[in-house]
């Protein structure tokens, strides 16, 4: 457990003096700090840094009400009072319980091997990774790639009148690639885990599926079928030529080898 989030300290203090009729209160914060860089071909595009914090405040009397806000400078006591007022419009017949011990904690933050400080990178490191990844994708795709690479720190915290005070934080990296009508996405907990392979595999599959239909002239052809195509043919044949036996309660199996099963086309 880390120190109480700065955004929740005022709510922790306000919970010592709840408004009249308020029996319990809770405040939860979700903060995202995002650093991103964009590559367009071999050129570095725009870079950006942003931060957003959302607050969810609940208060209970006979019933429970909530307030959602991004106004971090709002008076905590007033927000709790507003949540209590909102409880009057609740359709519930009784108050909802506030979080108890072990309410939540990110799995990554629980992992003894996870060290967020070691996963954070500088803007230069992020830029170099974006340049390398974009170059690898362009070489494979054979066309210009637009790549956005971002580092996001997600911090979540909660305080309430059950003496719950929890904070957890995790860093995630995400890459978004666009090229020739293709759009792909991948994410990882460390920058080193982001590789071009998932994009290349997805790009190849989509290009194959987008191939135009070609009408073939009547004749005899030799063709190589994928395992999925073979399975689809076999399943279709099974459904077409064994349904009669299946409906009658007899075995749907064909019987002896080379014995006809309802069709002169299949033996």
For the regions a language model picked out, list residue spans one by one.
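N-terminal alpha-helical targeting/anchoring segments
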Residues: 33-89
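Active-site-adjacent "lid" and substrate-binding segments of diverse enzymatic cores
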Residues: 139-267
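Ordered hydrophobic segments in well-structured contexts
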Residues: 24-28, 56, 66, 174
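Short, compositionally biased leader-like segments
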Residues: 2-33, 239-267
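Charged, low-complexity surface segments at secondary-structure and domain boundaries
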Residues: 1-4, 64-69, 108-121, 183-194
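Short, compositionally biased low-complexity segments
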Residues: 56-61, 96-111, 174-188
